[in-house]
From Swiss-Prot:
Belongs to the intron maturase 2 family. MatK subfamily. It is found in: Plastid, Chloroplast. PANTHER family: MATURASE K. One of its GO terms (biological process) is mRNA processing. It comes from the Eukaryota. Signal peptide: none annotated. GO terms for molecular function: RNA binding. GO terms for cellular component: chloroplast. Usually encoded in the trnK tRNA gene intron. Probably assists in splicing its own and other chloroplast group II introns. It comes from Maianthemum dilatatum. This is Maturase K. Keywords: Chloroplast, mRNA processing, Plastid, RNA-binding, tRNA processing.
Length: 520
């Protein structure tokens, strides 16, 4: 019993008890304003919201004063809702919108404090240096290239959501024991739920609590995913242990789990009693890998198809009993790696089988041996990228380039810079593709879309404009890309474009997915 309880309580001893007073500290809202609204890559530019740094200090002081007042959040939501639909009293709506945004950002910053401190202390205790290169998205592909070639089956998992808000608060309660702060967070989430329901019934888009509160709800979602992955690792470790014990010891271990009654999470005890003993016995897999990305997960195994089906139903039962989430079977697809291609982080990944014959010579006899080697392959999903370009209005659905009218008012240098930056970012992100023909097609679409945009601005035809521009437009799209590649792979010979057709390059400076990849 000490083993399980110690595992569940691991890293949970440093709970923060006094987070609620931070809501009344001015510097918290300054951090929320600077990092959340003015400097983060996840948020819209500050000019969208209609305020700047000059007015932030006054508004923060006014916000702190109003927080002390009773029923502030109720009036805040009501004012935002009324002004959103009525359309008058712009100042009241602005203050309500700003206050709701700042409270949400401050909630996110405050709840991140104990987890950030725990992460820093973990690195200090383990004496682990901070390898920023491991944050790169591309760092996962060499891992998959090394591991997936030895596996047989892969399960595509769509993580169920949305989860009930009370479950989210209970998850945080295991880490944070500040009762007033949790009550206020619960009230804030319920007010968001009421506003969400109201806006849906009136067929309006969610404005106040959707686009601007990404940080808080991203944190809540990550805490939810971390909780079920935390218990998944525990079950995985127990299943590994079961391979080394006899059936009699295993039955005693089941009885041991059923006796646990003094854990902090009582609903987890119910899970242990009702279904834990039914899952541990079949979760025996000596070679399994798990990768999560963008609300999805991949579970690859060397086991049989029957084992993967057992893991599938294990996930269904686990989500239902522990998180009270009803998941449908279509959320998990089991496929054989040798006959399956899956879309992963902007790449179409698959496992290629290469047949080769090896001549073996033994004394006077020689014979051929057919060998099969597996190779993890990644290519550019051209259809998905064209669909993303079509959504961004760079081309039609069929891939025919069109002009970008909203950029026609910019200067020529700004238009060239924007198109060139998009083209270089796509080439940079998809540099790990084994086939570069798809990238050339995407570059052609962007290059011609840029030419059409410039021709539209100057009220000319594309042919006339390109004849006047010459090869300058082509150089604009390729110059900086060559410099980046030559820095990573210095050569004595100049960079030749067709050489990159055969090279797969993984960069260690990519920390977010390209926006066009997200559209797909």
């Amino acid at each position: 019993m000490e083993e399980l309880q110690g595992y569940l309580e691991k890293d949970r001893s440093r709970q923060q008890h006094f987070l609620y007073p931070l809501l009344f500290q001015e510097y918290i809202y300054a951090l929320a304003h600077n990092h959340g609204l003015n400097g983060s890559i996840f948020y819209e530019p500050v000019e969208v919201f209609g305020y700047d740094n000059k007015s932030s200090l006054v508004l923060v002081k006014r916000l702190i004063t109003r927080i002390y007042q009773q029923n502030f959040l109720i009036s805040l939501v009501n004012d935002s809702n009324q002004n959103r639909f009525v359309g008058y009293n712009h100042n009241n709506f602005f203050f309500s919108h700003f206050h709701s945004q700042m409270i949400s950002e401050s909630f996110a910053i405050i709840v991140e404090i104990p987890f950030s401190l725990r992460l820093v202390s973990y690195f200090e205790e383990k004496e682990i240096p901070k390898y920023h290169n491991l944050r790169s998205i591309h760092s996962i592909f060499p891992f998959l290239e090394d591991k997936l070639s030895h596996l047989n089956y892969v399960s595509d998992i769509l993580i169920p959501h949305p989860i009930h808000m009370e479950i989210l608060v209970q998850i945080l309660q295991c880490w944070i024991q500040d009762v007033p702060f949790l009550h206020l967070l619960r009230f804030f989430l319920h007010e968001y739920h009421n506003l969400n329901s109201l806006l849906i019934t009136q067929k309006k888009s969610i404005y106040v609590f959707s686009k601007e509160n990404k940080r808080l709800f991203r944190f809540l979602y990550n805490s939810y995913v971390f909780e079920w992955e935390f218990l998944l690792v525990f079950i995985r470790k127990q299943s590994s242990y079961l391979r080394l014990i006899s059936s009699g010891t295993f039955l005693e271990r089941i009885h041991f789990y059923e006796k646990m009654e003094h854990l902090q999470m009582e609903h987890f005890v119910v899970v242990c009693r009702n279904y834990f003993h039914r899952t541990l016995w079949f979760c025996k897999d000596s070679f399994m890998h798990y990768v999560r990305y963008q609300g999805k997960a991949i579970l690859a195994s060397k086991g049989t198809h029957l084992l993967m089906k057992k893991w599938k139903y294990h996930f269904f039962n686990f989500w239902q009993y522990y998180f009270h989430v009803w998941s449908q079977p279509y959320r998990i697809h089991i496929n054989q790696l040798s006959n399956y291609s899956f879309y992963f982080l902007g790449y179409l990944s698959s496992l290629l089988l290469n047949l080769s014959a090896v001549r073996n010579q033994m004394l006077e006899n020689s014979f051929l041996i057919d060998t099969i080697t597996k190779k993890f392959d990644t290519i550019v999903p051209v259809i998905f990228l064209i669909g993303s370009l079509a959504k961004a209005q760079f081309c039609t659905v069929s891939g025919h380039p069109i002009s970008k009218p909203i950029w026609a008012d910019l200067s020529d240098s700004d238009i060239l810079d924007r198109f060139g930056r998009i083209c270089r970012n796509i080439s940079h992100y998809h540099s790990g593709s084994s086939k570069k023909q798809g990238l050339y097609r995407i570059k052609y679409i962007l290059r011609l879309s840029c030419a059409r945009t410039l021709a539209r601005k100057h009220k000319s035809t594309v042919r006339t404009f390109l004849r006047r521009l010459g090869s300058g437009l082509l150089e604009e799209f390729f110059t900086e890309e060559e410099q980046v590649l030559s820095l990573i792979f210095p050569k004595t010979t100049p960079f030749i474009l067709h050489r990159s057709h055969r090279e797969r390059i993984w960069y260690l400076d990519i920390i977010r997915i390209n926006d066009l990849v997200n559209h797909s």
